[in-house]
């Protein structure tokens, strides 16, 4: 039996991605707020992330009510086992946060259901509920088994998929309120970008 070694990078066959222009600086009731920067990692961790991802984007948005949402997006052209996505659970732990209440869930959008993970990161008085998802190629998947399965599907065709990790978080002691605000933000963001960009950011809905 011949073993297929994935060599064709899907990223090389797709349009070049630019996270800075892909996600608008203002959309719906949201605009960039430069007063708060999303979680920054130490230089050693950043060097590791630079090996995994081709591009990263970190922004904070604020709405007219003064509510803030932090957005972090990372794009990698090679999402094989060699360069698996760096999960937020690991990032936050490395920065001294306690990570708890990790739950797999679904986020209903106007385009379909998005599989997400939710978790709570706590450091001192900082209570940061987080929603994130991963894409492998054109499909949003939960990290772990589903992620490996999607990588395998590409691997069987000799292809190496690209992928995204999208993290949305808020500093809020009320987790329910935080997740509701994050859901609204995500829905607004998906509405503000084109079909091609939405597929890259959140996968093909219904696939």
Give short role names for the model-derived ranges:
Residues 4-23:
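Alpha-helical transmembrane signal-anchor/signal-peptide segments
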Residues 18-50:
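Short extracytoplasmic
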Residues 48-184, 188, 192-204:
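A cross-kingdom signal targeting lumenal/periplasmic-facing segments of multi-pass membrane
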């Amino acid at each position: 039996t011949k073993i297929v070694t994935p060599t064709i990078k899907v990223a090389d066959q797709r349009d070049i991605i630019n996270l800075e222009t892909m996600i608008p600086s203002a959309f719906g009731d949201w605009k960039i707020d430069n007063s708060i920067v999303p979680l920054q990692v130490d230089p050693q961790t950043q060097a590791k992330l630079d090996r995994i991802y081709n591009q990263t984007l970190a922004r904070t948005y604020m709405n007219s009510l003064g509510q803030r949402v932090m957005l972090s997006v990372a794009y990698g052209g090679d999402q094989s086992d060699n360069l698996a996505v760096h999960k937020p659970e690991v990032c936050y732990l490395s920065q001294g946060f306690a990570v708890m209440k990790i739950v797999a869930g679904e986020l209903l959008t106007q385009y379909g259901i998005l599989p997400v993970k939710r978790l709570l990161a706590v450091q001192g008085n900082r209570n940061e509920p987080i929603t994130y998802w991963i894409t492998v190629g054109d499909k949003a998947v939960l990290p772990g088994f589903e992620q490996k399965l999607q990588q395998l599907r590409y691997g069987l065709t000799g292809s190496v998929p690209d992928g995204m990790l999208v993290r949305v978080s808020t500093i809020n002691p009320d987790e329910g309120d935080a997740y509701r605000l994050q859901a609204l933000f995500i829905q607004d963001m998906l509405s503000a970008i084109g079909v091609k960009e939405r597929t890259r950011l959140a996968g093909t809905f219904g696939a």
